[in-house]
Amino acid sequence: MLKLLILKRIFLDYIFDGFKQALFLLFNADESVISAIKTTLLSSSISIVLALLIGFPLGFILGFFEFKLKRFIKLIVDTSLSFPTVAVGLILYALISSRGPLGEFGLLFTIKALILGQFILALPIVIALFSNLIENMNKKHFLLIKSFHLSPLKLVLTMIYELRFALISVVALAYGRIVAEVGVAMIVGGNIKYDTRTITTAISLETNKGEFASGIALALVLILIAFCLNFITHKLKRT
């Protein structure tokens, strides 16, 4: 019993010291921690914007129109939602490495590769969820919008506006996935300090090195991002 209490005390002290050092690193703006945060926010923000710009029109086409290969394409899109991020990273690595078809562009281990990988992860989520929203839209509401004989662009924008509250959740889900992923960022980004190191890859590295405080500091930031994302989502839905 005494041994158990001692082990419990040691564990709690270890956790407490880790949190204390983590807060010290955050409040003192540790350079490596801030760099990982900046890289994460920059790459994820650009990739989610690109995914929305391309995903909304493609999702609209998939949900609005009827064509021969629709079921097959939906199957591919839905399958890609659960595709392992490590596998995506490996495929992308093969494409952009020096021996790959896109090797001449020198994308490997750059912020551009990081953005491309996150974009590939976010795009199927946007397409799949938006197409489902279009298909499940109230038929009377749908026919009313269609009766206005709008141009294709205006029709897409009108649909987006009408489904804006549901789309907030789509954006939050897609953004949450790319911010929290490790596989693609590690493989094609290379986890280079002050360049392509993200919050998640930094947590993995620091924990493996035994730098528990740095890992906790970055984990706290990741939790804060998730909290802010959900807070903004709930606020927008109420407006």
UniProtKB/Swiss-Prot annotation:
Record-linked SUPFAM superfamilies: MetI-like
Subunit details: The complex is composed of two ATP-binding proteins (TupC), two transmembrane proteins (TupB) and a solute-binding protein (TupA).
Segments forming domain ABC transmembrane type-1: 37-233
Subcellular location, record wording: Cell inner membrane
GO MF assignments: ABC-type tungstate transporter activity
Primary localization class, coarse: membrane
Family annotation (InterPro entries): ABC_perm_TupB-like (IPR049783), MetI-like (IPR000515), MetI-like_sf (IPR035906), TupB (IPR053776)
GO cellular component: plasma membrane
Pfam families reported for this sequence: BPD_transp_1
PANTHER family, sorted: PERMEASE COMPONENT OF TUNGSTATE ABC TRANSPORTER
Family to which the UniProt record says this protein belongs: Belongs to the binding-protein-dependent transport system permease family.
Domain of life: Bacteria
Transmembrane segments: 45-65, 76-96, 114-134, 168-188, 212-232
Role this protein plays: Part of an ABC transporter complex involved in ultra-high affinity tungstate uptake. Probably responsible for the translocation of the substrate across the membrane.
Name of the protein in question: Tungstate uptake system permease protein TupB
Topological category with respect to the lipid bilayer: Multi-pass membrane protein
Key words, A-Z: Cell inner membrane, Cell membrane, Membrane, Transmembrane, Transmembrane helix, Transport
